């Protein structure tokens, strides 16, 4: 039941995310922002709220059973709202982090508001995501078909007052205020817009299932993590940006010379130019360009233009601008994690997307004398002058980052290219290391070892896999052994003799374990097979061998037919069978390996509900069954579909759309959700033990602790051991699972373990 709560909504003004250009006499977006992007969306709410120009235009709020009230600067304080908070009452907002930031950094110091207790806040946006609805209020209102909706004209009114304007000859003002003469009607429209947002937020909240106590507990911890933020190396970011700007200018000049004046960013014109040179592309996004560059017999000039587009359009190096623009005054990035951003409950990232950072830089060698990295084409180490040693192993290591940043500090593109070759690749390799511990602090990080593989093995009861994890065997090697028939002892002997893994580990075991666990076929294998040495028939053989070795996992995916379509029989089993039964028979629960499937009429509407071992629920709205149209469908086979919000054009139409699913994908959702529940439990345990999390990335947790000298003589760091022990402590529903954290490290800069 929804507890009584107040609802509030701020509308604000600020020049944050704008910069004045004297040459054009206009406001522009910050450096590196996408064309046309300015303001709050570029700098993020934490930096926005702290900007000296940020102020309140209006606050609308409603206490339970009361009409909507308004407060604006210059009016008497909203003491009834203060009294509600003082009595322990809860206040809800849509994206409550923004309201909390404005309250804390504008209203408390400037207007004497009391502190806002975080534990008394609720967020209807987070609740929407937990319920698998879209987060944006306008979209949420449309999906829920609310009788009161977000005012479509409000954006015009907000833009009139909330951001600076470009002066004209007839009107030299750079700001328009609601209190300016002649603004009465539009000002009232803005205040009414804020009132309506409060009403829409309340209506949406009434239609959604509230967060469970368990969900709310972790949401509050996520709020803590976002409020705390993570430190960044701001000077090094600016050094990298200086080199990046030079590289972009250089590549831009080359592109103009090759194309007759076109910039790499002019997508439509560049597509036309490429078409004229025999290269037809519907998109110039990174995936499309990468695919095109694999083609043979391409016009050399067109290939070079595509290479330039790939370099300049790299999303990884553009993270630098986001880090610079979103940094707070204490050189920390905040509010980077979106709670329950994915259907499974896993987070998604904001701004520089810390959940998706590049892992590697250029392939360098380390000087045996001074230990510093350089291009393997040099005859001598450019750092110390010692002659190069043939046969040194090429690659990228986290230890290289400080040395690369040392050269970046010269801000010389030529010098960076001399030492490391591709400057943009060198920058990309450093981005992870630009996230740092704060002054006087260290980072400690560790990640789970193959946690999804452990989860699916335990769910399915695949005993040889469970035994392998309990014996701490390498699952990639164990899987390769099952597929190829080569004994595990042979692989281990190879490793002892050669000092490196057998090639089958990467060529066979890795793509099998990463690509096949959720029903993947040839394309799924190839995503993870960097060697690309097998034909489709060979890959198909590997997949069949993997499946033959993992019958319990295949059973877990489930299906609707036993045997071949021409001589089998209908039977619903596993996750797919349970989902179909639940949809077909509302009100009944169907259990598979402790996972419950049922169809119920939830506050937001009819939905398929999957209840995990933890008790957390996954929601699939308006789930339906239809006759399957896939090739080789078994007699009477049904397909499952549900309604969801799609914001990625790669997956089809945008908006509230119907998507299909099947046993393998349901297994993927369930396994990822359970793995995330384990990570949540660990974060709560670390918090209780005094290890505050600054970042969590799927299977990894990063905490920040006071610095201390390195342990002497290779003695293990007790704090790393403690972090990993807490991470390996399982909740009651996963007792005895062979989950372990490994590869822990301690240091000043973030790196891949």
Question: Predicted regions: what is each one?
Answer:
Residues 1-135, 329, 345, 360-362, ...:
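Conserved RNase H-like, two-metal-ion catalytic cores of nucleic-acid enzymes
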Residues 1-41, 51-60, 143-149, 157-427, ...:
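Conserved "right-hand" nucleotidyltransferase catalytic core of DNA-directed polymerases
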Residues 121-122, 218, 265-269, 507, ...:
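Short Gly/Ser/Thr- and Asp/Glu-enriched loop/turn motifs at secondary-structure junctions
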Residues 208-218, 678-701:
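Active-site palm subdomain of RNA-directed nucleic acid polymerases
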Residues 279-280, 376-380, 481, 486-689, ...:
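Conserved catalytic core of nucleic-acid polymerases
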Residues 396-451, 470-484, 489-510, 514:
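Conserved catalytic alpha/beta cores of large enzymes that bind or transform nucleotide phosphates
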Residues 703-707:
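Short beta-strand-to-loop capping motifs
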Residues 716-728:
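Short amphipathic alpha-helices in soluble, non-transmembrane regions
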């Amino acid at each position: 039941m929804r507890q009584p709560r107040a609802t509030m909504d701020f509308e604000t003004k600020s020049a944050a995310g704008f910069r004045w250009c004297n040459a054009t006499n206009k406001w522009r977006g910050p450096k590196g922002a996408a064309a046309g992007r300015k303001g709050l969306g570029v700098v993020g709410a934490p930096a926005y709220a702290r900007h000296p120009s940020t102020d309140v235009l209006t606050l609308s709020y409603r206490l339970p059973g009361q009409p909507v009230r308004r407060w604006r600067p210059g009016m008497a304080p909203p003491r009834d709202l203060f009294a509600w908070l003082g009595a322990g009452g809860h206040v809800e907002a849509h994206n409550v982090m923004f309201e909390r930031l404005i309250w804390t950094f504008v209203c408390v110091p400037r207007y004497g508001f009391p502190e806002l207790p975080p534990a008394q806040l609720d967020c209807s946006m987070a609740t929407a995501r937990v319920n698998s609805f879209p987060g944006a209020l306008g979209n949420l209102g449309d999906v829920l078909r609310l009788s009161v909706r977000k005012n479509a004209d409000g954006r015009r009114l907000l833009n009139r007052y909330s951001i600076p304007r470009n002066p004209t000859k007839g009107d030299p003002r750079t700001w328009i205020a609601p209190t300016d003469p002649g603004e009465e009607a539009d000002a009232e429209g803005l205040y009414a817009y804020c009132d309506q947002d409060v009403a829409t937020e309340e209506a949406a909240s009434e239609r959604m299932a509230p967060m469970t106590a368990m969900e709310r507990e972790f949401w509050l911890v996520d709020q803590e993590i976002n409020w705390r933020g993570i430190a960044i190396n701001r000077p090094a970011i600016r050094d990298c940006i200086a080199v990046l700007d030079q590289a972009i200018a250089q590549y831009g000049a080359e592109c103009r010379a090759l194309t007759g004046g076109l910039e790499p960013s002019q997508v439509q014109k560049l597509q036309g130019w490429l078409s004229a040179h025999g290269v037809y592309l519907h998109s110039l996004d990174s995936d499309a360009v990468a695919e095109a560059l694999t083609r043979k017999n391409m016009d050399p000039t067109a290939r070079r233009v595509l290479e330039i587009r790939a370099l300049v359009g790299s999303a990884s190096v553009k993270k630098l601008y986001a880090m610079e623009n979103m940094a707070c005054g204490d050189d920390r990035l905040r509010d980077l994690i979106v709670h329950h951003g994915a259907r499974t409950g896993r987070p998604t990232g904001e701004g520089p997307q810390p959940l998706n950072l590049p892992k590697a830089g250029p392939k360098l060698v380390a000087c045996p004398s001074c230990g510093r990295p350089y291009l393997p084409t040099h005859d001598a180490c450019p750092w110390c002058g010692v002659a190069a040693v043939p046969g040194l192993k090429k690659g990228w290591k986290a230890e290289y980052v400080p040395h690369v940043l040392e050269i970046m500090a010269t801000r010389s593109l030529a010098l960076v290219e001399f030492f490391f070759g591709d400057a943009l690749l060198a920058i990309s390799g450093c981005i992870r290391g630009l996230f740092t511990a704060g002054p006087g602090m260290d980072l400690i990080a560790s990640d789970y070892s193959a946690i999804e593989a452990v989860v699916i093995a335990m769910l399915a009861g695949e005993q040889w896999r469970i035994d392998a994890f309990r014996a701490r065997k390498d699952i990639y090697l164990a899987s390769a052994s099952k597929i190829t028939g080569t004994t595990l002892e042979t692989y281990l002997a190879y490793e002892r003799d050669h000092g490196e893994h057998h090639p089958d580990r990467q060529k066979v075991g890795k793509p099998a374990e990463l690509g096949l666990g959720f029903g993947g076929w040839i394309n799924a294998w190839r995503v993870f097979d960097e060697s690309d040495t097998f034909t489709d028939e060979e890959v198909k053989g590997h997949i069949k061998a993997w499946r033959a070795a993992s019958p319990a996992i295949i059973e877990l995916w489930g299906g609707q037919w036993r045997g071949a379509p021409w001589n089998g029989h209908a039977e619903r089993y596993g996750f797919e069978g349970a989902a179909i039964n639940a949809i077909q028979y509302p009100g009944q629960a169907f259990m598979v390996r402790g996972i419950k499937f049922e169809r119920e009429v939830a506050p937001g509407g009819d939905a398929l509900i999957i209840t995990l071992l933890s008790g957390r629920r996954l929601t699939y709205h308006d789930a339906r069954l239809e006759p399957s149209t896939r090739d080789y469908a078994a007699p009477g086979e049904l397909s499952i579909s549900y309604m969801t919000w799609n914001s990625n054009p790669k997956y089809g139409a945008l908006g509230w759309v119907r998507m299909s699913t099947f046993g393998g994908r349901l297994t993927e959702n369930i396994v990822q959700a359970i793995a995330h529940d384990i990570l949540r439990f660990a974060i709560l345990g670390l918090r209780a033990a005094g290890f505050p999390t600054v970042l969590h990335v799927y299977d990894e947790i990063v905490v920040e602790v006071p610095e201390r000298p390195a342990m002497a003589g290779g003695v293990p760091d007790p704090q790393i051991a403690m972090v990993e022990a807490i991470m390996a402590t399982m909740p009651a529903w996963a007792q005895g699972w062979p989950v372990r954290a490994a590869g822990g490290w301690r240091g000043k800069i973030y790196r891949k373990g």
